[in-house]
């Protein structure tokens, strides 16, 4: 018996959702331990036994002063670092000690964020069909996706996807993947988790590798989680916070080696080799034009903005290049100030901050009163993720 084309089309149609993917719940979490940025250079050079490097400390002080960061959360405490001097050296074998932390703490912090996202979503966790877990911190088998499934008590049949070692653009990547999963599987509810712990990158200073110091001045710990699904069931109280309209990824021209990370016996090493803010600002308009041409939008100030805050220079140069008003990056700069650069989790924190502030301010939509918005992830490659978002009325 040959199946007719019509019935096959019907099967395919029945497998797919009718509407666009929406974010149905957001949750965030950070370790309790935190550092005040103004005090961090003294602490960092003391704990790494580097106080004799006075010129380098002055450079690091300037990096921290210019970072626009007020505080950062970190799992690593002073007591722990005192017990693990190899992690405080610039290049000492320390991967085992680092792995012992991240394989436990990455899923644990992810669970905290996931519990909050599920609570806001308001549905039983048995309705979760897919899990996308992302971390740049450590690698293990079975992965953090498996550990989180166990910690949360999700169904064993949950379809899992584990993303390791992607870097700072991956907050956009997880949205792109969750969108495809939700829209191509009717009834799918995707739990997305980004969890980052800097225990894998922390190291002492080196006067021959200043680019490594940049990471020490910016990186921090945090986890964010979302529930993503299409066709929200309003009868049980499902309601989107943002809708995802399109998602794209590109590698910027002439950017090979601009940001590199390498997992070695000494942990994850981080290298900045080119003018990253310049490369991003030079190419960002092309990504915007490609994303918003179908919508007939070319006024970048008419959008709400969620950009990965790799550092203040990236935000400054993007603003100048595009002629953005200062308030466009308010939510982005707030998250950078209060949390630092949490790699893949940052843009999800900014989504959370934006919808909360929009509600507080009494504006018309979750996107600062505007209908259309853009979310950018920037990271190793240089890779850029561009997600077009639509807000919902408040």
From Swiss-Prot:
<comment type="pathway">
    <text>Secondary metabolite biosynthesis; flavonoid biosynthesis.</text>
</comment>
<dbReference type="Pfam" id="PF02797">
    <property type="entry name" value="Chal_sti_synt_C"/>
</dbReference>
<protein>
    <recommendedName>
        <fullName>Chalcone synthase</fullName>
        <ecNumber>2.3.1.74</ecNumber>
    </recommendedName>
</protein>
<feature type="active site">
    <location>
        <position position="168"/>
    </location>
</feature>
<feature type="modified residue" description="N-acetylvaline">
    <location>
        <position position="2"/>
    </location>
</feature>
<keyword id="KW-0007">Acetylation</keyword>
<dbReference type="InterPro" id="IPR018088">
    <property type="entry name" value="Chalcone/stilbene_synthase_AS"/>
</dbReference>
<comment type="similarity">
    <text>Belongs to the thiolase-like superfamily. Chalcone/stilbene synthases family.</text>
</comment>
<dbReference type="GO" id="GO:0030639">
    <property type="term" value="P:polyketide biosynthetic process"/>
</dbReference>
<dbReference type="GO" id="GO:0016210">
    <property type="term" value="F:naringenin-chalcone synthase activity"/>
</dbReference>
<comment type="function">
    <text>The primary product of this enzyme is 4,2',4',6'-tetrahydroxychalcone (also termed naringenin-chalcone or chalcone) which can under specific conditions spontaneously isomerize into naringenin.</text>
</comment>
<dbReference type="Pfam" id="PF00195">
    <property type="entry name" value="Chal_sti_synt_N"/>
</dbReference>
<keyword id="KW-0808">Transferase</keyword>
<dbReference type="InterPro" id="IPR011141">
    <property type="entry name" value="Polyketide_synthase_type-III"/>
</dbReference>
<dbReference type="GO" id="GO:0009813">
    <property type="term" value="P:flavonoid biosynthetic process"/>
</dbReference>
<dbReference type="InterPro" id="IPR016039">
    <property type="entry name" value="Thiolase-like"/>
</dbReference>
<keyword id="KW-0284">Flavonoid biosynthesis</keyword>
<keyword id="KW-0012">Acyltransferase</keyword>
<dbReference type="InterPro" id="IPR001099">
    <property type="entry name" value="Chalcone/stilbene_synt_N"/>
</dbReference>
<dbReference type="InterPro" id="IPR012328">
    <property type="entry name" value="Chalcone/stilbene_synt_C"/>
</dbReference>
């Amino acid at each position: 018996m040959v199946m007719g084309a019509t019935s096959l089309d019907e099967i395919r149609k029945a497998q797919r959702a009718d509407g666009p993917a929406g974010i149905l719940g957001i949750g965030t979490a950070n370790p309790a331990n935190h550092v005040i940025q103004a005090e961090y250079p003294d602490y960092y050079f003391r704990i790494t036994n580097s106080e004799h490097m006075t010129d380098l400390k002055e450079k690091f002080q300037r990096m921290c002063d210019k970072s626009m960061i007020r505080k950062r959360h970190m799992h690593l405490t002073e007591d722990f670092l005192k017990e693990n001097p190899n992690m405080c050296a610039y290049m000492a074998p320390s991967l085992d000690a680092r792995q012992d932390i991240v394989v436990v703490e990455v899923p644990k912090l992810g669970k905290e964020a996931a519990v909050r996202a599920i609570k806001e979503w308001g549905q039983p966790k048995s309705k979760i069909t897919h899990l996308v877990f992302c971390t740049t911190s450590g690698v293990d088998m079975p992965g953090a996706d498996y550990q989180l499934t166990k910690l949360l008590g999700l169904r064993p049949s949950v379809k899992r996807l584990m993303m390791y070692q992607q870097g700072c653009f991956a907050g956009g990547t997880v949205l792109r993947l969750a969108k495809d999963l939700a829209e191509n599987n009717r009834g799918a509810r995707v739990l997305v988790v980004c969890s980052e712990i800097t225990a894998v990158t922390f190291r002492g200073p080196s006067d021959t590798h200043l680019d490594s110091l940049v990471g020490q001045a910016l990186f921090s710990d945090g986890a964010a989680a979302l529930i993503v699904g299409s066709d929200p069931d309003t009868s049980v109280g499902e309601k989107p916070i943002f809708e995802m309209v399109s998602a794209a990824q590109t590698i910027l021209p002439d950017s090979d080696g601009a940001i590199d990370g390498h997992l070695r016996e000494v942990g994850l090493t981080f290298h900045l080799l080119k003018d990253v803010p310049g490369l991003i600002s030079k190419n960002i308009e092309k990504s915007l034009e490609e994303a918003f041409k179908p919508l007939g939008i070319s006024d970048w100030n008419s959008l709400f903005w969620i950009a990965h805050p790799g550092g203040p220079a990236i935000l400054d140069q993007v603003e100048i290049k595009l002629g953005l008003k200062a308030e466009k990056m308010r939510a982005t700069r707030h998250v950078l100030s209060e949390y630092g650069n949490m790699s893949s989790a940052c843009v999800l924190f900014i989504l959370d901050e934006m919808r909360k502030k929009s509600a507080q301010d009494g504006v018309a939509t979750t996107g600062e009163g505007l209908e259309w918005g853009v979310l950018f992830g920037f990271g190793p490659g240089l890779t850029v993720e561009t997600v077009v978002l639509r807000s919902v009325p408040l």
